[in-house]
C-alpha cells in the first residue's frame, strides 16, 4: 500500500472542532461570525477544524451553500491549521460532487458520514466509499455515527476500505470505547482512528486514538486543546484533570439534538446570533437554566 499520505496522517491529531455554521436570525449563513469563530478557535489552540459536519448543519444547507461555506472556510483559515470538510451524503453522486468541491476549495481532507436513511448493506457502504475514493483523489475520512445514520460501518468493511491509500482515517462516534479499541488494534497502523464522542474520547486516546472531533470544543477550545495536547504526550494525569473540569459541559451539549445546545451556548457567550434552520429549533426553555448554570460554572458567562 502506498504511503503518500503518511505525512498528512500525522497532522490528524489532537483537538479538532466540529464547528457550528453561524446563522443570522433569518437563517442566512453569517460569514463574519464564521470568520471570528475560526480565528478564535485557532488562537485558542485547536489543532484542526471541521467545516459543515453534523454540527455545522450540513443537512439543512443547500448544495451551493455547502460548497460556499467550505470555500470561505478554507480561504479564511489560509493554511494555519488543517481543514476537514464534511462532504458526506446518502447519495453517492452528491457525495462525489461535494468532495470534488472540497478538493477544489483546497480542503485538506473530506469527512464522509455513512449514508443515512436509505440503510445500505455493508457491500453498499463499501461500494459507496470506494466510488468516492476513486473519483476524488484527496485524503478522506470515514465517519461512523450509527445513532444518527441508522447504519453501522462494520469493522470488516473498514478493513476493506483501508486498502485505498486516500482513505486515511475514521471518526468513530459510536461512543463505544470497546468498538474503538478493536478498530485501533486491527487498523491503527493503517488508518488514523479519531473519537467523535466527547464523553469517551480521552479513554479512547489511552488505547491509541490520535484525537477527538468535538462538539464541546466550540465553547471551550483552550481546555479541549489542553486535554488532547497532554494526552498526545502521554500525560493522562493532566489530561484527566482538565477533562474532569469540563466534563459536565459534554452532557449539557446534548440535552437536545446537537447543534441546538451548542448554538444556544455560543449565543449566550455573544459569539453568534440566534440562528438555526428548521427542522432544528432553538433550545427548549426548560433547559435554559440548566445550560446557563453549566456555562456560568465553567466561567463562560457572567
Swiss-Prot record:
It catalyses: L-aspartate 4-semialdehyde + pyruvate = (2S,4S)-4-hydroxy-2,3,4,5-tetrahydrodipicolinate + H2O + H(+). The keyword rRNA-binding does not apply. It is found in: Cytoplasm. Keywords: Amino-acid biosynthesis, Cytoplasm, Diaminopimelate biosynthesis, Lyase, Lysine biosynthesis, Schiff base. Pfam families: DHDPS. CDD domains: DHDPS. Its EC number is 4.3.3.7. One of its GO terms (biological process) is lysine biosynthetic process via diaminopimelate. The active site is at 143 (proton donor/acceptor), 171 (schiff-base intermediate with substrate). The keyword Oxidoreductase does not apply. One of its GO terms (molecular function) is 4-hydroxy-tetrahydrodipicolinate synthase activity. Pathway: Amino-acid biosynthesis; L-lysine biosynthesis via DAP pathway; (S)-tetrahydrodipicolinate from L-aspartate: step 3/4. Homotetramer; dimer of dimers. Catalyzes the condensation of (S)-aspartate-beta-semialdehyde [(S)-ASA] and pyruvate to 4-hydroxy-tetrahydrodipicolinate (HTPA). This is 4-hydroxy-tetrahydrodipicolinate synthase.
Amino acid at each position: 500500500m502506498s504511503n503518500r499520505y503518511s505525512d498528512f496522517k500525522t497532522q490528524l491529531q489532537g483537538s479538532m472542532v466540529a464547528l457550528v455554521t453561524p446563522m443570522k436570525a433569518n437563517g442566512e449563513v453569517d460569514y463574519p461570525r464564521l470568520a471570528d469563530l475560526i480565528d478564535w478557535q485557532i488562537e485558542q489552540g485547536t489543532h484542526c477544524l471541521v467545516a459543515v459536519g453534523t454540527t455545522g448543519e450540513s443537512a439543512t444547507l443547500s448544495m451551493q451553500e455547502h460548497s460556499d461555506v467550505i470555500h470561505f472556510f478554507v480561504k479564511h483559515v489560509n493554511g494555519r491549521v488543517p481543514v476537514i470538510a464534511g462532504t458526506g451524503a446518502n447519495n453517492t453522486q452528491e457525495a462525489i460532487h461535494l468532495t470534488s468541491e472540497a478538493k477544489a476549495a483546497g480542503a485538506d481532507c473530506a469527512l464522509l458520514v455513512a449514508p443515512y436513511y436509505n440503510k445500505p448493506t455493508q457491500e453498499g457502504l463499501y461500494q459507496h466509499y470506494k466510488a468516492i475514493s476513486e473519483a476524488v483523489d484527496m485524503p478522506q475520512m470515514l465517519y461512523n455515527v450509527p445513532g444518527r445514520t441508522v447504519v453501522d460501518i462494520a469493522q470488516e468493511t473498514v478493513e476493506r476500505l483501508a486498502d485505498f491509500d486516500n482513505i486515511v482515517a475514521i471518526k468513530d462516534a459510536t461512543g463505544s470505547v470497546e468498538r474503538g479499541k478493536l478498530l485501533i488494534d486491527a487498523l491503527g497502523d493503517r488508518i488514523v482512528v479519531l473519537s467523535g464522542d466527547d464523553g469517551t474520547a480521552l479513554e479512547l486516546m489511552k488505547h491509541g486514538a490520535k484525537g477527538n472531533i468535538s462538539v464541546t470544543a466550540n465553547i471551550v477550545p483552550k481546555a479541549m486543546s489542553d486535554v488532547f495536547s497532554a494526552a498526545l504526550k502521554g500525560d493522562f494525569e493532566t489530561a484527566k484533570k482538565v477533562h474532569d473540569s469540563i466534563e459536565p459541559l459534554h452532557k449539557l451539549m446534548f440535552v437536545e439534538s446537537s447543534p441546538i445546545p451548542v448554538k444556544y451556548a455560543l449565543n449566550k457567550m455573544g459569539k453568534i446570533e440566534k440562528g438555526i434552520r428548521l427542522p432544528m429549533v432553538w433550545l427548549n426553555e426548560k433547559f435554559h437554566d440548566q445550560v446557563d448554570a453549566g456555562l456560568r460554572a465553567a466561567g463562560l458567562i457572567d
